[in-house]
Amino acid sequence: MQRDPGTALVLFSGGQDSTTCLAWALENFERVETIGFDYGQRHRIELDVRPYLLERIRTDFPAWRGRLGGDHMIDMAVLGQISDTALTRGVEVALNANGLPNTFVPGRNLLFLGFAAALAYRLSAKHLVIGVAETDRFSYPDCRDDAVKAIQLALNLGMEKRFIIHTPLMHRDKAQTWALADWLGGEALVKLICEGSHTCYSGDREHRHSWGFGCGTCIECNLRAAGWEQFRSCKEAPVTAHEMT
């Protein structure tokens, strides 16, 4: 595979999707840096596992080690202060009247991509990589393809740059996300994502399942578990390089 000689900045939360996207970026770009956001999320454990994941990628994947650069953590406490959601308040996860779960944090990805672009501007990084998808049962408005394209246009107009926002998972479900990780880094990466990444909205690191740690009952745990089972059941099916790009 011929890699882009430029620099990519990956929005890296410490979850399954962003870890997979980090591997994708390391396979596709010569230089990769990461950015994370602390907005007071109730599942803050995802931020705590980030250093472990970055270190393991450096030690376990020699081909990627030299391409993985700096990590940047941004304090976004103000987002948690103005958001009344299940991810920023101690309330039970439920559906809102508009059909979206109350785990939706309005404006989150718009702000994340804006701050990431500001950092990318300083780093002279043209590429932004984010693990959003519109294939989940609940597709958040700021995770949809048309929203991301609109954000890219706004950033380019507002900064007079030519950023490209890459969304490797946009049209992939969770089973296909597991398959992409397997294709990129083999069983070693799949195992690292299982053991090291965190997706559970409850922040549960006590209960270990075949697909990783979590409460096993929240929306994200259910999606991750279902995707894992489908991925393992289809593991023997051949996968082409075209399907993974």
UniProtKB/Swiss-Prot annotation:
Keywords: ATP-binding, Ligase, Metal-binding, Nucleotide-binding, Queuosine biosynthesis, Zinc. GO terms for molecular function: ATP binding; ligase activity, forming carbon-nitrogen bonds; zinc ion binding. Its cofactor is Zn(2+). Pathway: Purine metabolism; 7-cyano-7-deazaguanine biosynthesis. It is an enzyme of class 6 (ligase). GO terms for biological process: queuosine biosynthetic process. ATP binds at residues 12-22. Its EC number is 6.3.4.20. This is 7-cyano-7-deazaguanine synthase 2. The lineage of its organism: Bacteria, Pseudomonadati, Pseudomonadota, Alphaproteobacteria, Hyphomicrobiales.
